[in-house]
């Protein structure tokens, strides 16, 4: 079963910023990043409970090949994507989004 995904605007901005940064470093790398994000989101949509809870209801899924993670909350039949964060960033920044 695929669950409904709602990507918060802040998470969309995170993905766009990372895409632009990777694309500026190496043309085509931004597109690879977006494909990796899409694959991660597909996995979350198929089985949102498979990923670790890291704070209250917030779960995280690591993005393959890139030092980023997806932060989300699963509530009944909907996944709310809160952020796409670089693993070296201060976790306090995403805590403000809860």
Which ranges hold each PLM region?
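Arg/Lys-rich, positively charged N-terminal/basic patches that mediate binding to nucleic acids
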Residues: 1-34
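Enriched for short, Lys/Arg-rich terminal
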Residues: 69, 73-98
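Basic/aromatic recognition patch in beta-strand/loop cores that engages polyanionic ligands
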Residues: 39, 46-78
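Solvent-exposed interaction patches of small proteins and small membrane subunits
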Residues: 30-32, 55-57, 89-92
């Amino acid at each position: 079963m695929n669950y409904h995904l709602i990507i918060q605007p802040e998470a969309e901005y995170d993905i766009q910023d990372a895409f632009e940064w990777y694309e500026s470093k190496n043309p085509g790398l931004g597109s690879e990043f977006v494909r990796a994000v899409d694959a991660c989101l597909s996995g979350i949509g198929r089985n949102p409970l498979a990923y670790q809870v890291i704070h209250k209801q917030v779960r995280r899924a690591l993005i393959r090949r890139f030092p980023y993670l997806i932060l989300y909350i699963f509530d009944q039949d909907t996944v709310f994507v809160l952020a796409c964060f670089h693993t070296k960033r201060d976790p306090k920044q995403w805590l403000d989004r809860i």
